[in-house]
Amino acid sequence: MASSALICDTEQWKGLQAHVGEIQKTHLRHLMHDVERCKAMTAEYEGIYLDYSRQRATGETMEKLFKLAEAAKLKEKIEKMFRGDKINSTENRSVLHVALRAPRDEVINSNGVNVVPEVWGVKDKIKQFSETFRSGSWVGATGKALTNVVSVGIGGSFLGPLFVHAALQTDPEAAESAKGRQLRFLANVDPVDVARSIKDLDPETTLVVVVSKTFTTAETMLNARTLKEWIVSSLGPDAVAKHMIAVSTNLELVEKFGIDPKNAFAFWDWVGGRYSVCSAVGVLPLSLQYGFPIVQKFLEGAASIDKHFRSSSFEKNIPVLLGLLSVWNVSFLGYPARAILPYSQALEKFAPHIQQLSMESNGKGVSIDGVQLPFESGEIDFGEPGTNGQHSFYQLIHQGRVIPCDFIGVVKSQQPVYLKGEIVSNHDELMSNFFAQPDALAYGKTPEQLHSEKVPEHLIPHKTFQGNRPSLSLLLPSLSAYEIGQLLAIYEHRIAVQGFLWGINSFDQWGVELGKSLASQVRKSLHASRVEGKPVLGFNSSTTSLLTRYLAVEPSTPYNTTTLPKV
């Protein structure tokens, strides 16, 4: 029977609710005058510096949040995750993405078995295969070396690896390793995405990686069959074994598809898709592009944060502090969204990955025991690199809705540029905005200041900034593979902390199932109408009307022959 105990029933939660009234009487422009408060609201680990002094919080707020963490048994829940306890209770699974980057000699158990040797077995296999591939020893059906890789997956099999790939592309060491190679990702079942993923590629020099744990994911397998046809139509059916490999545990279906099971790389049911970047899902395609040593540095960066998260006191624990502040903003101050604003173009795919990681993990309406939550949980995550975002949606953040912001900056640019005679370098210009925006949000601009600047009276309401808008700043020393791994793990653990505090299961995703089930019904109806001429039946009037309108137009691809992209 489900327990009715909820975190909101605790004295610590109620104490924070009462404390909101005190915070609402404050303004950040005054709180920021307290130098000791500002100093206290920082944390540092391996050169990563967190400043959360621009949060609508005081030392008392933080003490109350630490007590809430204690009431939620946060330390115990973190330990259970690292121990391999089945904290994903709805699927009866361990949650062990930390094992994917653990040192070879570490012991992490699932069902009483140390999984680390098996993880390293797969990594060793990836290392060997990627070295063979990159050396030119692995050749395609015509004897040519393969230099292009298309990774086919969706959701966590796509967004996480894409984020890391985008971040590594301009890192000098990684870029040097990737010279003469291309890595592309195919996720959307939209044929336009297929066309884009293979545009200007030659099947002769292309390897396709199919990422599907069960080898049954509808979108991924249709895309895989499409690329298989692209290869076969050019090189013949025997080419599949040389031009396609898999990340899957279903070796029977892998072999049936035409891929040699020896070229299938495993991952496990204790790895959720959105937490799978450090498994073969990400490590294999990234190693083919950049070489395993680069990817191992990425894994080591993530492992360093795992250690920090597990062992540091909450007062100086970066993922814990971030998670606590998110709960404070969402559940107590009533801010439902968060803007992720990396001042680094290399991190352009970071916000989309965190959007999935956060919203799929914590977009839940019931507790882990199945009790309806009577409070707000989960966040709406979005973002764009600075300074692009400043010319896009910052207007709303400054003068519209209050949206807490994560500003992420990098001390050393991957690609430094300076033009002689300019006031600052290109990177300093970028970072000038990184340092200025949090203060603009916190302090705002008062009518009195505008009067002193002799702004016309009729413009004063339009140029007034209320300020008091919370943000935090995360400053990374550089953006090598190691720091990219650290950044990923910080956000993975932050999101877990939020779920642990809210008392929800951050590691299942039942919300995606209903739509998939309904899509299956529509798929059958489309087939019956296209092939057998049957009318649309079994849907409500609105859906029937939409389907009828869609089917009234002759399809651009006849159903009696194969059609591949023309781009």
From Swiss-Prot:
<dbReference type="GO" id="GO:0048029">
    <property type="term" value="F:monosaccharide binding"/>
</dbReference>
<feature type="binding site">
    <location>
        <begin position="156"/>
        <end position="157"/>
    </location>
    <ligand>
        <name>D-glucose 6-phosphate</name>
    </ligand>
</feature>
<keyword id="KW-0963">Cytoplasm</keyword>
<dbReference type="InterPro" id="IPR035476">
    <property type="entry name" value="SIS_PGI_1"/>
</dbReference>
<dbReference type="GO" id="GO:0051156">
    <property type="term" value="P:glucose 6-phosphate metabolic process"/>
</dbReference>
<dbReference type="InterPro" id="IPR001672">
    <property type="entry name" value="G6P_Isomerase"/>
</dbReference>
<dbReference type="Pfam" id="PF00342">
    <property type="entry name" value="PGI"/>
</dbReference>
<feature type="binding site">
    <location>
        <position position="391"/>
    </location>
    <ligand>
        <name>D-glucose 6-phosphate</name>
    </ligand>
</feature>
<feature type="binding site">
    <location>
        <position position="516"/>
    </location>
    <ligand>
        <name>D-glucose 6-phosphate</name>
    </ligand>
</feature>
<dbReference type="InterPro" id="IPR023096">
    <property type="entry name" value="G6P_Isomerase_C"/>
</dbReference>
<comment type="subunit">
    <text>Homodimer.</text>
</comment>
<dbReference type="GO" id="GO:0016853">
    <property type="term" value="F:isomerase activity"/>
</dbReference>
<comment type="similarity">
    <text>Belongs to the GPI family.</text>
</comment>
<feature type="active site" description="Proton donor">
    <location>
        <position position="360"/>
    </location>
</feature>
<dbReference type="GO" id="GO:0004347">
    <property type="term" value="F:glucose-6-phosphate isomerase activity"/>
</dbReference>
<dbReference type="GO" id="GO:0097367">
    <property type="term" value="F:carbohydrate derivative binding"/>
</dbReference>
<feature type="binding site">
    <location>
        <position position="356"/>
    </location>
    <ligand>
        <name>D-glucose 6-phosphate</name>
    </ligand>
</feature>
<dbReference type="GO" id="GO:0006094">
    <property type="term" value="P:gluconeogenesis"/>
</dbReference>
<comment type="pathway">
    <text>Carbohydrate degradation; glycolysis; D-glyceraldehyde 3-phosphate and glycerone phosphate from D-glucose: step 2/4.</text>
</comment>
<dbReference type="GO" id="GO:0006096">
    <property type="term" value="P:glycolytic process"/>
</dbReference>
<feature type="binding site">
    <location>
        <begin position="212"/>
        <end position="217"/>
    </location>
    <ligand>
        <name>D-glucose 6-phosphate</name>
    </ligand>
</feature>
<feature type="active site">
    <location>
        <position position="391"/>
    </location>
</feature>
<dbReference type="GO" id="GO:0005829">
    <property type="term" value="C:cytosol"/>
</dbReference>
<dbReference type="InterPro" id="IPR046348">
    <property type="entry name" value="SIS_dom_sf"/>
</dbReference>
<comment type="function">
    <text>Catalyzes the conversion of glucose-6-phosphate to fructose-6-phosphate, the second step in glycolysis, and the reverse reaction during gluconeogenesis.</text>
</comment>
<dbReference type="InterPro" id="IPR018189">
    <property type="entry name" value="Phosphoglucose_isomerase_CS"/>
</dbReference>
<feature type="active site">
    <location>
        <position position="516"/>
    </location>
</feature>
<keyword id="KW-0413">Isomerase</keyword>
<feature type="binding site">
    <location>
        <position position="360"/>
    </location>
    <ligand>
        <name>D-glucose 6-phosphate</name>
    </ligand>
</feature>
<protein>
    <recommendedName>
        <fullName>Glucose-6-phosphate isomerase, cytosolic A</fullName>
        <ecNumber>5.3.1.9</ecNumber>
    </recommendedName>
</protein>
<keyword id="KW-0324">Glycolysis</keyword>
<dbReference type="InterPro" id="IPR035482">
    <property type="entry name" value="SIS_PGI_2"/>
</dbReference>
<keyword id="KW-0312">Gluconeogenesis</keyword>
